[in-house]
Amino acid sequence: MGENTRPFPIQPWVGEGKLSQKMLGEIITWKIQGVAISHADLLSGLMASDLDCDVAKELAPRNAFARACSKLDSERIIRKIAEDHATITFQFTREANEGGKFHYYFESLLFLNKYSGSITSENLELEQLAKEEFGRCMEARTANDVTRLVQRLFERHADLFSIRDQGGVYFVPEVHNDFIVKVERFVRNIGGSLQRFPIPAGSPQGDRAVQEAVAHGLQAIIDEHLQAVQKFGEDTRPDTLRRAEEKIRTTKMKIEGYSFYLDKKREDLEASLQQASELLRSRMSFLIGAPSEEAELVLV
């Protein structure tokens, strides 16, 4: 950086209270060191930061199992062949080079419970081997696991609005400032870092950028609602329909809560959410036999 003898523009404000203007929120980004973090250290960090420890239990077993498979695939091929709401089924196939040609022999199917992490197989030797490696991978969490954990914390207790299409940099509304402090403490407790960049209101560029980030993030949520409802069919469970209804209700509350940022974009978002609501009402009417007008959706 070259030498600059001009006064730094913010310098005269320091100590005079001129920075205490209304804040829109903060742009945050975090970095987790690329070393394995024990499950115990994660729990300790969450507890010390007064954060929800249950999210550590929700780190998907499938991610740990994928890492375990990389240790188990010597001379075998492992493929996912089926998945339902609770279980993923994998096929283990032994690969052998015989007479200059590869031959493939079915070994066994292995079943992974997506929630409990339990592993079962008719091949008890393979089951035990998979359990041992899976246990090691569940205990040692990666930086990607921690990033998903942080995102899950915000999903439960606040909101992250992506600034970049690639992710990694987010806007967090000012109302969640206290929660950012807790997450920052947690990230530092486990050896990472979290950078915070406060965004004051009143700058045309800043106001517009925040508005676009919040509107884009909310529209992405609505698009997810639409895509999910469009896939609902005769095998869709009633509790799945009710969860979709609750998600739409929650999104409506978010649009209302963040109306300060949205201005005229609020109308577009409400119209888009209305479309998702009407589609869900129609599907509920067809699937559970209730008249369309009796589907108790928050948007009518």
Residue spans of the language-model regions?
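Non-Sec secretion/translocation targeting segments of pathogen effectors
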Residues: 1-3, 299-300
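Terminal interaction module
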Residues: 2, 37-57, 63-70, 140-148, ...
